[in-house]
């Protein structure tokens, strides 16, 4: 045991020496200090836990599961059984001149009078609709006008193998043989894909989507039940302060970043969203405070573009005057963009690296029209054009980009580079702001419990004194502005403590503070 202890010390020392140049480099000092402090904060949030309304969660779960069996019966009636080919059979004879029964074991009566040697026939069976079968789901939705764009991992890997010049001929041939299957069935049954089902689709297809959403809600609740602590009445999730490749925080046990949220454009697909978010709450006599960064990814994009018109639009533009970014983006996209809401959906998808297929689904247009709209949008902002044509290719060629705080983030993909800039920038700003407001509240001697940190949002539990809660919210929101100034960004950052209904984000549960 002592030898292993000595070995651990030796390995750690060699590891330290390996990274010493980076550790002592001025470029990394700010990032290293931030991430080391975030380790402590992540552990603190895990230990605090998030209060959870288990009784209401069980009621919702029972309500959801009680709808599934009747809905499955309705769908089996709406989608009649289909004839499924099991195999092609060529009857053979035995040495006695009779047909071999090897290929007829499935027959109940054993009557082979309708079959003869060498006469090929198809062995089929009726297949009832199974709402749990991805293949059958895709078949029925495709027939209803579904236009999915999110591929499964298998489909993506198949395409990579075909394009990989290092793949062996056998590997490439195998992938090419599987490609027709993936082209038909290689689509995720995800919310984004389900949203592409037209509103005019036949009722059975829409009921199928409803069933899929209910089942997803039930799975999420099951995950929460498994994580619930009966002693503390809380869920103690794990926060990995640098879990994603963009160095955003990741969450597991359960994934507290994957809580349903309302979708104004698809209210029928937001079922139970508010009710499930409301399960995350506070004990009696306490308040929950929600603070987030105002349009942080658009502001970071404005920083990188350094375009005065876009910066003004993001920070001061209004929907009423038609000077906000979503209205301007609608004009930049051209006639194919029918509404401001579509322009809003487009920009956030574009920032995450959406391809032409996804843009086509968002705008409800052809692939050719989507490509023209995207190109029009990029060309309308010189700063964005410079990013796309010069900065991104340069960073992809060198295999990394430099973050706002000096850290190097590995990325050699032009397709993912813009999302990397924005998500890493968001992570840097929000982490530094979290550290800053924690220090300030300690200085002010204001007690609080930090219970969640998701991307650009914090949830904090505090006393039921509204003045204290408002002070906490003000300190948190102001920390975002201060960090933006300290990083010397081209576009000002701002925090907000208003919820989605534009009222003060102080309440009894997460649905009231989000």
Predicted regions and their residues:
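Interdomain boundary/hinge elements
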Residues: 311-316, 373, 384-388, 486-498
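A structural signal for short secondary-structure junctions
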Residues: 281-284, 443-446, 451-455, 487-490
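Short, conserved charged micro-motifs
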Residues: 465-472
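Function-dense linear segments that define catalytic or interfacial modules
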Residues: 241-337
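Conserved "right-hand" nucleotidyltransferase catalytic core of DNA-directed polymerases
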Residues: 1-268, 285-287, 297, 364-367, ...
């Amino acid at each position: 045991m002592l030898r292993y202890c000595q070995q651990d010390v030796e390995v750690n020392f060699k590891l330290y020496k390996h990274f010493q140049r980076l550790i002592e480099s001025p470029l990394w000092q700010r990032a290293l200090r931030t991430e080391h402090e975030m380790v402590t904060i992540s552990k603190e949030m895990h230990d605090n836990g998030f209060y959870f309304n288990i009784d209401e969660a069980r009621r919702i779960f029972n309500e959801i599961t009680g709808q599934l069996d009747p809905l499955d019966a309705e769908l089996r009636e709406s989608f009649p059984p289909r004839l499924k080919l099991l195999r092609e059979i060529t009857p053979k004879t035995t040495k006695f001149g009779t047909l071999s029964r090897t290929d007829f074991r499935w027959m109940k009566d054993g009557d082979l009078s309708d079959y003869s040697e060498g006469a090929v026939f198809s062995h089929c069976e009726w297949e009832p609709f199974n709402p749990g079968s991805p293949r059958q789901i895709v078949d029925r939705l495709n027939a209803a006008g579904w236009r999915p764009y999110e591929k499964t991992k298998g489909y993506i890997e198949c395409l990579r193998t075909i394009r990989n010049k290092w793949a062996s001929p056998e590997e490439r041939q195998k992938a090419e043989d599987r490609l027709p299957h993936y082209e038909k069935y290689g689509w995720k049954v995800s919310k984004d894909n389900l949203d592409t089902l037209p509103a005019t689709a036949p009722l059975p297809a829409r009921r199928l989507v409803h069933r899929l959403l209910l089942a997803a809600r039930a799975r999420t609740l099951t995950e929460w039940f498994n994580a619930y602590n009966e002693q503390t009445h809380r869920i103690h999730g794990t926060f990995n302060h640098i879990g994603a490749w963009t160095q955003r925080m990741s969450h597991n046990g359960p994934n507290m970043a994957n809580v349903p949220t309302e979708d104004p454009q698809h209210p029928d697909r937001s079922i139970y969203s508010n009710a499930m978010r409301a399960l995350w709450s506070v004990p009696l006599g306490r308040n929950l405070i929600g603070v987030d960064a105002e349009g942080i990814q658009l502001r970071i994009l404005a920083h990188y573009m350094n375009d005065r018109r876009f910066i003004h639009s993001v920070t001061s533009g209004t929907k009423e005057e038609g000077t906000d970014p979503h209205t301007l983006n609608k004009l930049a996209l051209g006639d194919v963009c029918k509404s401001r809401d579509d322009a809003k959906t487009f920009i956030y998808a574009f920032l995450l690296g959406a391809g032409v297929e996804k843009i086509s689904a968002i705008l409800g247009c052809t692939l050719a029209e989507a490509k023209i709209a995207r190109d029009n949008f990029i060309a309308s902002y010189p700063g964005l054009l410079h990013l796309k044509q010069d900065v991104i290719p340069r960073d992809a060629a060198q295999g990394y980009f430099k973050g706002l705080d000096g850290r190097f983030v590995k990325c050699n993909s032009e397709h993912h580079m813009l999302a990397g800039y924005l998500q890493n920038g968001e992570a840097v700003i929000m982490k530094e702001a979290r550290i800053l407001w924690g220090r300030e509240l300690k200085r002010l001697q204001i007690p609080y419990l930090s219970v969640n940190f998701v991307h650009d949002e914090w949830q904090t539990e505090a006393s039921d004194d509204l003045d204290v809660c408002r002070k906490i919210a003000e300190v948190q929101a102001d920390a975002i502005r201060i960090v933006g100034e300290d990083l010397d960004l081209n576009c000002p950052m701002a925090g907000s403590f208003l919820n989605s209904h534009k009222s003060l984000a102080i309440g009894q549960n997460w649905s009231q503070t989000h």
